[in-house]
Amino acid sequence: MINDIQKRTAERMQKSIEALKHEFAKIRTGRAHPSLLEHIRVSYYGNEVPLTQVANVAVEDARSLAVTPWERNMVQAIEKAIMTSDLGLNPSTAGTVIRVPLPPLTEERRRDLIKVVRQEAENGRVAIRNIRRDANNELKAALKEKLISEDEDRRSQEQIQKTTDQFIKEIDKLLEQKEADLLAV
């Protein structure tokens, strides 16, 4: 039972880390990355679908992306979706390939993005701590029902705290890497 709680706790914490990595991937650094356009939705025969379902997004060079629609008639819709996104990008079309140049980040924009990244990291830490609290509550309930001894409860809480510390360190490391990416010119 204790092992189940610890295993479930570690799995949930790992999912929180994955969610944080996904959020970090959306935040633009100075380099081009296909995940930058992942959240853009395109009108496709009356339905809103993710850009990645109607086109191939590839890195052309460090500061530009190439979007190649799978259907010729989608070029205008994709171009419009990129322009109206909150990324402030200005695509240009050459035949069926849409080139998306990424303007360099201003110092002010970098500072704003660092604030956003720090907030996302803090949200990740809070999620990890909430998972720890849930696990500790499960242990207390098991102790109350006499399913585990006080020693087992204490040992398990210490183990869960170690796991929590490990995942918080991982979040701090991810934050440090993302900040370094944002500050790199």
Swiss-Prot record:
UniProt keyword Nucleus, yes or no: no
Biological process annotations from GO: cytoplasmic translational termination
InterPro entries, alphabetized: Ribosome_recyc_fac, Ribosome_recyc_fac_dom, RRF_sf
Name of a matching Pfam family: RRF
Swiss-Prot/TrEMBL keywords: Cytoplasm, Protein biosynthesis
Subcellular compartments: Cytoplasm
One term of GO molecular function: ribosomal large subunit binding
GO-annotated cellular components: cytosol
Claim: Protein biosynthesis is one of the keywords in the record: yes
Main location: cytoplasm
Annotated family: Belongs to the RRF family.
Purpose: Responsible for the release of ribosomes from messenger RNA at the termination of protein biosynthesis. May increase the efficiency of translation by recycling ribosomes from one round of translation to another.
Protein name: Ribosome-recycling factor
Originating organism: Methylococcus capsulatus (strain ATCC 33009 / NCIMB 11132 / Bath)
Source lineage: Bacteria, Pseudomonadati, Pseudomonadota, Gammaproteobacteria, Methylococcales
Designated gene of the protein: frr
